[in-house]
Curated annotation (Swiss-Prot):
One of its GO terms (molecular function) is manganese ion transmembrane transporter activity. InterPro entries: Mntp/YtaF (IPR003810), Put_MntP (IPR022929). Keywords: Cell inner membrane, Cell membrane, Ion transport, Manganese, Membrane, Transmembrane, Transmembrane helix, Transport. It comes from Desulfosudis oleivorans (strain DSM 6200 / JCM 39069 / Hxd3) (Desulfococcus oleovorans). Probably functions as a manganese efflux pump. This is Putative manganese efflux pump MntP.
Length: 189
């Protein structure tokens, strides 16, 4: 597999992480280096590990994973999305919104945005292609796109109405990504 093909796959896989990072950038009040590091590290790590897991899973479980991977990604994204919407209606003054770069929310987003990379790993095993170089490029590309998405999102968050409804906009983006994943897997046709 040539370098251009690997990079093309990496960019395509990074798009979900990029979109989620934009939503996270809008959602967060201020973004520090820790936010950048946590989100980029986790998204990059999960994007790099999933092809390796898929590659080792190989043909033995390929059919099972391919049948349900899109549903897993959708339900994880929907779960996080509905929690964000629920939190947006919590009017308490002392209410603090959950940071998408911490805890269970971070892990769920990392898994949901990297499920497609698992399928890529399965494909690489079928093609008898080594997974190590693609996994490295995929992880680094996802981390870079995540940082770019956070930067774009934080700038977009300066728009007053967008800042006020950031959690709902972010939830909508996550739900849209989940629905797009289902559409790409032929659920709606």
């Amino acid at each position: 597999m040539n370098t251009l093909t690997i990079f093309g796959i990496a960019v395509a896989l990074a798009m979900d992480a990029f979109a989620v990072s934009i939503a996270a950038g809008v959602f967060l009040r201020s973004i520090g280096l820790r936010h950048y590091f946590r989100l980029a590290w986790h998204f990059g790590l999960f994007q790099a590990l999933m092809p390796i897991v898929g590659w080792y899973a190989g043909l033995s479980v390929r059919g099972l994973i391919e049948r349900y991977d899109h549903w897993i990604a959708f339900f994880l994204l929907a779960f996080v999305s509905f929690n964000m919407i629920r939190e947006s209606f919590d009017a308490g003054e002392n209410h603090t919104k959950a940071d998408p770069t911490r805890g269970l929310r971070l892990v769920l987003l990392s898994i949901a945005t990297s499920i497609d990379a698992l399928a890529v790993g399965l494909s690489l095993s079928v093609l008898n292609v080594s997974v190590w170089m693609p996994a490295t490029v995929i992880g680094i590309t996802a981390a870079v796109f995540t940082v770019g998405g956070l930067m774009m999102g934080s700038r977009a968050g300066d728009i007053p109405w967008l800042r006020r409804y950031a959690d709902r906009v972010g939830a909508g983006v996550l739900l849209f990504i989940g629905l797009r994943i289902l559409y790409a897997h032929g659920v709606f046709y």
